[in-house]
C-alpha cells in the first residue's frame, strides 16, 4: 500500500527463523541447521516409505522452532531484500534473525531495527520524503540487480512488477 497511497512509511521485517534440529536420520548430522528445505526432503522420504509419519511430524515441528520467516531464499526473504534494496527498509533490515533459538520472543536486532525505523520515519516525515520519492526507477534497477545477485525467488517478478505499477515506475517484464 505504500506505493499505492504514497503515505509516509517504511517496511520492517521480522527476521528469519532460527534453524531447528532433530536427532534421527540424515537430519541429525545437520546439527542445529534444519531448514524448510529439509521438510521437503522429509516429506518425499515419508511418501517413499523411508521415513515414518512420526518422524515426519518431528521434522515438521522442528524445522522452524521460533518466530520469523523460513530460512531459505524464498518469497519472504526475497521481498525483504527487495524492500531494503529499493530503499523502503533500513540497511541490514532484511538480514537479521527473528529470535535466539526460540528462547527469546524477539531478537535484539529486530528491536534495534524497529526503533531505528521509527526514528527514520520521523525524519522522513519532517523532511516531507514520501515512498514515491524513494521508489524511483533507479531504486527498482538496484532491487533487480540485488535479487539476481542473491538468487532470489522467481515470485519477485510478480511482486516487483505490481509494486512498480503502483509506484508508476516504467519497469516491465522485459527489464527484469
Feature roles, as predicted:
Residues 172:
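Short, well-structured active-site flanking segments
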Residues 1-142, 147:
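Active-site cavity-forming subdomains of large catalytic enzyme subunits
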Residues 158-169:
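Alpha-helical support elements that line or immediately flank enzyme active sites
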Residues 176:
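Hard-cation-handling environments
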Amino acid at each position: 500500500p505504500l506505493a499505492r497511497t504514497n503515505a509516509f512509511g517504511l517496511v520492517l521485517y521480522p527476521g528469519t527463523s532460527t534453524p531447528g534440529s532433530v536427532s534421527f536420520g540424515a537430519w541429525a548430522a545437520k546439527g542445529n541447521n534444519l531448514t524448510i528445505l529439509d521438510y521437503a526432503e522429509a516429506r518425499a522420504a515419508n511418501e517413499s516409505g523411508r521415513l515414518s509419519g512420526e518422524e515426519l511430524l518431528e521434522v515438521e515441528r522442528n524445522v522452524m522452532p521460533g518466530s520469523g520467516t523460513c530460512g531459505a531464499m524464498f518469497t519472504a526473504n526475497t521481498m525483504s531484500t527487495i524492500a531494503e534494496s529499493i530503499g523502503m527498509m533500513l540497511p541490514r533490515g532484511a538480514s537479521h534473525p527473528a529470535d535466539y533459538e526460540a528462547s527469546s520472543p524477539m531478537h535484539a536486532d529486530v528491536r534495534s531495527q524497529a526503533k531505528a525505523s521509527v526514528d527514520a520515519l520521523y525524519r522522513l516525515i519532517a523532511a516531507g520524503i514520501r515512498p514515491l520519492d524513494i521508489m524511483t526507477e533507479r531504486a527498482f534497477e538496484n532491487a533487480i540487480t540485488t535479487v539476481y545477485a542473491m538468487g532470489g525467488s522467481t515470485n519477485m517478478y510478480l511482486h516487483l512488477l505490481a509494486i512498480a505499477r503502483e509506484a508508476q515506475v516504467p519497469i516491465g517484464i522485459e527489464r527484469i
